[in-house]
Structure formats: structure tokens, C-alpha cells
């Protein structure tokens, strides 16, 4: 039936382990080994065999679960990364509950792409990421002897995409938020504003500001190991970030946290509310493709704001201030200069606009 050696070895290992477990149980519980007891043990584990005693091959989804467990453990995946691969598994299952490796020919892969586009309504950029995750799984499973279907190697669909728009606050907008007088009826936004602005002044991701402890702050700098990439960073404090820390000095928080950080989802909701309150409602256009169809959507800026806006605000303003990208990368933990290019483009555009001011004199 084309069963791979990995499947056979896995099955034999299971049988050996079951025998060891049975022997240990008899010893610890001082059971008398009888024919009936042995038959009962075999019956308990009969799901490992099919009706005629043949080895049952793992399904694609069994292998996918093994992939997630092994690769996630080796690479120290964050909760967010696990969620991405679980989402892919769910997409595959909805596409075909009995999906096999042999089904994923170029046509099968194309059908899956069509399913993601037409049935799930995913953007091309999202489909591209899902395909990348799927190819990693197929490569890993092929290397581990689970299949010999290499169609994924030559499957390279042309998916129209656009550069992702970077939503950030200009310095004036950031100062508007930082200095805004929040009304008494919305005082619950005060702490959210402080944490958000702290990210804008330090480049911290939500996961890192959430984990920030008081003992991480020494000699005028933050000394952290990032959650997402496990980078060890030293981020110097400026007068704005220091003032926010000073505001909460002596205020006790759970787990010795430095700041009052709420859940990511709740904070995202409140940041949008804060942006609206501060009048950050200029129209922003978001462009993307679904198949060959171009979609342009216009939103008030505050609707596009979230915890991620803090980090992007720091990078954009730092580069526009003239701080060299290689210095900014030391604070942010970026190792790839390519990641800085969109921000440098923003800074170049801003400089061109600034030069026009001379024409008005």
C-alpha cells in the first residue's frame, strides 16, 4: 500500500511502548499475568490496528499535527505562530476533510488557492502566506518520508499584491495624543494612552511591553529579550518614555510589571477610540487584491490604529529625524536592512515635502 518506513517504525515503537507499559503495570500493581489479561491489553489497544491486522497509515492531518508539535518546539513558536498554522490546518480540513498528500498535485494546490479566494474571501497577500506555510509543511513531511509528491516545488502562482501600507503617527499626531486632555467620562483611556505612547517612544511590540518588568529597567535603558524573536536588546530611554515610567513608579502591578498593560484585543479597541477622540480621522486608503480584482477601501485613520502602530510610529519618526537606520535597528532588533526600506521611503517622501516649504518663502 506504499506505507513508508517512518509509519512502520512509528507503529512498531507504539507496540513496544504498549508492551513496556503493560509490563510496568503488572509489576507495580502486582498483577498475575494471565492469558485473559494479555488479551484484554491487546483489545484495549486494538485501535492501533485495522480489522485485518494491517498497519494503518497516518493521515495528512495526523502528520500536520506532528509537524506543528515538533517544529513549534524546535523553533520556540509563539502563541501567534501556532495560531497561524492551526488556521492553515483548519482551511485544509474545510477544503477536504479526507485530504491526502497525493491530492496536492499542482491542480490540487490550485484548487486550494481558489477555495481560499472564493469560499474564504482571503486577500492575495494572505493566501501567499498560507501557501508559504503549506510548502514548509510539505517539505518537512517529504523529508521525513511521509510522501513523495513534489508538485509543491514547481507550484508558483502569480498573486497580485501591493506593498503593505504602514500606518503610523507623525510627530505632531503623537504629541496630540500624548498631551490630549482625556475627559473624566473616558478616564479608562488614560492608561491605554500611556502604554501606547510608551511603545511609540521605545519601539516595543505589544508582547514585549506586556512582559516588561521593573527589573528590566536599569541605567536609563530597557534591557529585554523579545518574545517574538528572542533578541536581547538594550533600548535607551528618552524623556518621554522615562516620564511615563516615572508616572507609575511605586504603583504595584501583577508580576512586578512596569506598566498597566491590558489584553491586546481590548487595547486595540481602546486605541481606536483614543484616536477618534484625538481627531485622527483623516482618510487613509488601503489597497489590496482578491484574485485579479483590485479593492480600494478608505478608512478614517483611527480605525487602522492598534498596538502595532506604536512600533511603526517609533521607526518612522526616528528615521525622519535623521537617525541612521543601522542605529534604529539596534533598538528594534531588526537584523534585515530590507525591513527598513519602507520606512526610509516614508522619510524620503517627507523630506521632499519639507523642501517645498522653501518655495513658499
For every predicted segment, state its role.
Residues 1-58, 62, 66, 70-75:
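N-terminal helical hairpins
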Residues 91, 102-104, 119-153, 205-207, ...:
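N-terminal DNA-binding recognition helix of tyrosine site-specific recombinases/integrases
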Residues 124, 128, 147, 151-206, ...:
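Basic, Lys/Arg- and aromatic-enriched nucleic-acid-binding interface segment
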Residues 177, 236-243, 247-249, 342-361:
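DNA/chromatin major-groove-contacting recognition/catalytic segments
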Residues 184-186, 252-253, 257, 272-330:
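Short, basic (Lys/Arg/His-rich) helix/loop patches that form interaction surfaces
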Residues 202, 211-247:
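Conserved tyrosine-mediated DNA breakage-rejoining catalytic core shared by Y-recombinases
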Residues 215-221, 304, 321-342:
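Short, polar N-cap/turn motifs at the start of nucleic acid-interacting alpha helices
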Residues 226-230, 267, 332-357:
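Catalytic-site neighborhood detector that most strongly recognizes the C-terminal catalytic loop/helix
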